[in-house]
């Protein structure tokens, strides 16, 4: 059995299939773990979502910011942008089934026997594993409710929930978890989230900002953290316990697959149209 972790697919289904064929992925024996953002911008979000749904227990994904945005679009809470390439998905006959499957996906997954944790954007350095489990579970519980659109999705967009407050309750607590696990790149030196800078560290000109993974974290010392979201990193982080897998396939770069047991990365260049 092999565990394969894939970066932000974002509708780049042809590239995903190429990678899986190259490693002879077999869902009857192997598992495919995705760091989230299965949809948006790429040419075939519909096929991507259908494929992961079809994998059953052999497919494991977490929610990314684009996945959450899809929930908002389907709920008519946001307007679809042509650049997101989501019209075929939103108009698909099985969209309700796909949405119901997607909203049941968590914000974090772990592989305890390998001490691997996967989230979309990273893990706040202030959090222990117990806190990570607890906070992500609170969001999952909210997404499972029949009123999830009104109670959570319609109100999740907020740049004000940028500081971790263990005494926070209700929506503000959920907002911080969503912001941290699906949007985080940089933190200010005092530990609160920045939502603006997307450049790689060498190009960030704000001395008050540091990548989230440069802060001291007990969890990062004990576990391997697998994440995506930050395409500008192009997978380059100077720490063997960090696996940055977003390498910008939907922007014309690469889709990256990491084979856990071999600690090996395999890449597929964005395919040309036609």
Give the label of every model feature segment:
Residues 31-36, 81-90, 193-201:
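Short, basic, glycine/proline-bearing loop/turn elements
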Residues 27-30, 56-58, 118, 222:
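A general structural motif
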Residues 6-7, 33-36, 61-64, 119, ...:
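Active-site neighborhood of phospho(di)ester-bond hydrolases with catalytic His/Asp-centered motifs
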Residues 46-49, 54-170:
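Active-site neighborhood of divalent metal-dependent phosphoester bond hydrolases
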Residues 1-55:
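N-terminal active-site segment of His-dependent metallophosphoesterases
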Residues 133-274:
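Acidic, His/Gly-rich catalytic cores of divalent-metal-dependent hydrolytic chemistry
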Residues 2-5, 18-21, 42, 55, ...:
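Hydrophobic N-terminal alpha-helices or hydrophobic patches in metabolic proteins across all domains
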């Amino acid at each position: 059995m092999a565990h394969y972790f894939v970066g932000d697919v974002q509708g780049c289904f042809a590239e995903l299939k190429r990678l899986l064929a190259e490693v002879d992925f077999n869902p009857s024996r192997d598992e495919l773990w995705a760091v989230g953002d299965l949809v948006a911008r790429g040419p075939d979000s519909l096929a991507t979502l259908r494929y992961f749904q079809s994998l059953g227990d052999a497919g494991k994904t977490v929610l990314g910011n684009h996945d959450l945005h899809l929930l908002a679009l389907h709920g008519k809470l946001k307007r679809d942008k042509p650049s997101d390439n989501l019209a075929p998905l939103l108009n698909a006959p099985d969209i309700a089934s796909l949405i119901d499957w997607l909203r049941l996906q968590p914000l974090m997954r772990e592989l305890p026997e390998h001490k691997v944790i996967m989230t979309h954007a990273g893990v706040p350095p202030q959090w222990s594993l117990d806190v990570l489990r607890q906070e992500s579970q609170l969001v999952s519980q909210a997404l499972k409710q029949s009123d999830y659109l009104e109670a959570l999705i319609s109100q999740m967009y907020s740049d004000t929930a940028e500081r971790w407050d263990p005494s926070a309750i209700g929506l503000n607590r959920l907002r911080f978890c969503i912001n941290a696990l699906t949007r985080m790149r940089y933190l200010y030196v005092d530990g609160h989230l920045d939502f603006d800078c997307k450049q790689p560290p060498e190009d960030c000109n704000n001395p008050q900002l540091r990548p989230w993974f440069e802060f001291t974290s007990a969890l990062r010392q004990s576990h391997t953290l697998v994440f995506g979201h930050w395409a500008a990193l192009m997978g380059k982080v100077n720490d063997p316990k960090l696996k940055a897998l977003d390498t910008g396939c939907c922007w014309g770069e690469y889709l990256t697959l990491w084979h856990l047991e071999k600690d090996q990365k395999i890449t597929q260049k964005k395919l040309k149209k036609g």
